[in-house]
């Protein structure tokens, strides 16, 4: 988390040049919580507090966890903003049989911001990848959570349709495969280009 703090710096959401909302979930009430002011790092930390991976975050009188538990594709927070285009990213797209091809590290070597992101991802990578049974407890838990989030995402998107939808295949990587960051960044670029091409056609 120290690397993440270094990426976002020490600033408040109100100081950002564009509007920002981090979405979290109130663990006790199950309510969706929009974090639109206060410390940026604290808001992001609460919004990524994935159950069984990161500890919940105490925010005022609430205990917050990952917002994806109740809203995997949060479009509603943007409805009040003055925007020309609404772009959504859904990581629960249709599964694909072939993984994305690996890319060269040179593609990100010349960009300091991407280097900082890669440093954060590499810091989270375990020294040794533990051998986990193909359908072990964690695998079943995360797959079940993903299935629930897929259903919630479809319901949310039926109510709020974005102008551009960028979809990533749900089986693009495992939950802890942080070391595949370069490959997945390139996959994201490819899917973004495809989504905008469809939107223009």
Task: Tell where the protein language model's regions lie, with residue ranges.
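Patatin-like phospholipase
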Residues: 1-201
